[in-house]
Amino acid sequence: MANAPHGGVLKDLLARDAPRQAELAAEAESLPAVTLTERQLCDLELIMNGGFSPLEGFMNQADYDRVCEDNRLADGNVFSMPITLDASQEVIDEKKLQAASRITLRDFRDDRNLAILTIDDIYRPDKTKEAKLVFGGDPEHPAIVYLNNTVKEFYIGGKIEAVNKLNHYDYVALRYTPAELRVHFDKLGWSRVVAFQTRNPMHRAHRELTVRAARSRQANVLIHPVVGLTKPGDIDHFTRVRAYQALLPRYPNGMAVLGLLGLAMRMGGPREAIWHAIIRKNHGATHFIVGRDHAGPGSNSKGEDFYGPYDAQHAVEKYKDELGIEVVEFQMVTYLPDTDEYRPVDQVPAGVKTLNISGTELRRRLRSAHIPEWFSYPEVVKILRESNPPRATQGFTIFLTGYMNSGKDAIARALQVTLNQQGGRSVSLLLGDTVRHELSSELGFTREDRHTNIQRIAFVATELTRAGAAVIAAPIAPYEESRKFARDAVSQAGSFFLVHVATPLEHCEQSDKRGIYAAARRGEIKGFTGVDDPYETPEKADLVVDFSKQSVRSIVHEIILVLESQGFLERQ
């Protein structure tokens, strides 16, 4: 029999509200609607299907404050992660939202009405406190970056009534709700289930770890990977799920089941581990594996880890009696070539030879080198290689930034010709003036409009890069915020190289044959970069060149050398 849900009752709002679906759907059409973001959709789905039991909605201020301060809901139940619905003052005013208002929650992907929320309260969170207490306070932590840069200024708390399930079109048969997974376990006769959380591909070490955990508890295995929002730069879930499916037959017959979890991770380390344990308990698991640096985001720019390697294990251990799910603490396992076996690192005798492959080394080997079978299975490697083609066939973006008349356009055109001569991929050119004319003709030159212009360039560059093209963009891009946005966006699809064309302003003015700088100096043009609007020097350029001291040919050659050093120009 599956484990009891957290709080004693599975809050399956979809099943609870199904008899009233027609009535609720009709009402939802008449209410003010709030369109949810991708993260809010992930949260709503797990609220409605009971994955976040005992929650029945987005947290009001009483629940939010106590979760931040004490890892508990207002009623005393352990819960470690704030589940909140953020909204701007503009939306609150436009929709006339207040306590007791009923609003429709809508899916941004297809405009379907998913739920009705009855507002308990609207409150301004203390983001500084949330960042410190929940995530540790490091401003580089991805959840804190999201909190400070994306989350709106108010939270809306209230209970949910379910109208429609979210639509999914990928791996539908593997997207078990908690109730469905519990029924599945009962059909199989499973009474002890060890859940394994992952956001990465699984290799032999993971198989060995989970089999050891199951055998030590005389249990079965639930492979429960996250397919919602994970860490930027992670391998896409389509590739990962194919790899999990390929791995499944390597388990002893009947030992393991694969189910997908549409969770939006926060990478919250200790807090996240407690949250993950609650979610797996709600899905019927009796045991949960918490490994080294569970749900941690790695390290900051100084190389400092956000969390200690076993902080997550200690956090879950603290609440184990109240959580009602047994934590299986596992250290890393490593390969012993002399005996052809895996063992936990703390069980390896001193002096015994071990082998391992780091994530960085694996990425290198996926492109061109051999991956031994002791590390991963051939069928898994094949799938990963299909989604990680050699650098020579991948897309990339060269982003040139600098003052007007710094030489960006001449460099970009010459680079385009050079790359076309090399062959192997299509080459797209996004010059500043061309983009302004074709994509951003209605925009002015305020800071907001300039940022919007770069966002549009980044969108186009991202999609072209994803399709395997070489993209050369050459806007002025005077603001660090905009350049960082472009790097982050394109890096989801391929490689991004920022080239600072650091030609001095004096040279740009002196060689300006069109007289644009002179007109700006006379006050005829307002908001002109370098005259009455600043150019923020790039903090992390991949290459710095100077058109006043170098020729176009030498600059293009430097860029080509950067690409060649990264393997983008190797012949196949």
Swiss-Prot record:
Residues that coordinate or bind sulfate: 197, 199, 295
Regulation: Allosterically inhibited by 3'-phosphoadenosine 5'-phosphosulfate (PAPS).
Positions bound to ATP: 197-200, 291-294, 333
Pathway involvement of the protein, from the record: Sulfur metabolism; hydrogen sulfide biosynthesis; sulfite from sulfate: step 1/3
Subcellular location per the Swiss-Prot or TrEMBL entry: Cytoplasm
Keywords recorded for this protein, A-Z: Allosteric enzyme, ATP-binding, Cytoplasm, Nucleotide-binding, Nucleotidyltransferase, Transferase
ATP-binding recorded as keyword: yes
Active site: 198, 199, 200
Cellular component GO terms, alphabetical: cytoplasm
Source taxon at top rank: Eukaryota
Binding site for 3'-phosphoadenylyl sulfate: 433-436, 450, 476-477, 514
Site (Transition state stabilizer): 203, 206
Annotated region (N-terminal), positions in chain: 1-169
PANTHER family, A to Z: SULFATE ADENYLYLTRANSFERASE (PTHR42700:SF1)
Assembly information from the UniProt record: Homohexamer. Dimer of trimers.
The name this protein goes by in its record: Sulfate adenylyltransferase
Species of provenance: Penicillium chrysogenum
